[in-house]
Swiss-Prot record:
The gene is rpsS. One of its GO terms (molecular function) is rRNA binding. Signal peptide: none annotated. The lineage of its organism: Bacteria, Bacillati, Mycoplasmatota, Mycoplasmoidales, Mycoplasmoidaceae. Protein S19 forms a complex with S13 that binds strongly to the 16S ribosomal RNA. GO terms for cellular component: cytoplasm; small ribosomal subunit. The keyword rRNA-binding applies. It holds the Pfam family Ribosomal_S19. This is Small ribosomal subunit protein uS19. Belongs to the universal ribosomal protein uS19 family. Keywords: Ribonucleoprotein, Ribosomal protein, RNA-binding, rRNA-binding. The keyword Plastid does not apply. GO terms for biological process: ribosomal small subunit assembly; translation. InterPro entries: Ribosomal_uS19, Ribosomal_uS19_bac-type, Ribosomal_uS19_CS, Ribosomal_uS19_SF.
Length: 87
C-alpha cells in the first residue's frame, strides 16, 4: 500500500534543514546522509548527497528528473557479479 496523499511526502527533518541552510548561503557542499527513505524535493536539485548503501557512501547528484523519487533508489545496495558461463 502506498502512503496516504494527505500526509504528503516524507523527508528527514535534519536533512531538509541542511539543504535549506545551504540554499540560503548559496553553498554546494556534499551532504552526507544515511536517510535512504527521504523523498527528493525540488529544493534538492543541484546538490550532491553522499547516500549510505550499507557499506560506503555513494555520491548522488540530484537533477530535476529525480524529483519525487527516494534517495536510496540511486544508491544500489547489492553488486551483481554476473551469471557463471560454465554450461
Amino acid at each position: 500500500m502506498s502512503r496516504s496523499s494527505k500526509k504528503g511526502a516524507f523527508v528527514e527533518a535534519s536533512l531538509y534543514k541542511k539543504v535549506l541552510d545551504m540554499n540560503a548561503q548559496q553553498k554546494k557542499k556534499i551532504i552526507k546522509t544515511w536517510s535512504r527513505r527521504s523523498t527528493i524535493f525540488p529544493d534538492f536539485v543541484g546538490h550532491t548527497f553522499a547516500v549510505h548503501n550499507g557499506k560506503k557512501f555513494i555520491n548522488v547528484y540530484v537533477t530535476e528528473d529525480m524529483i519525487g523519487h527516494k534517495l536510496g533508489e540511486f544508491s544500489p545496495t547489492r553488486t551483481f557479479k554476473g551469471h557463471s558461463s560454465n554450461r
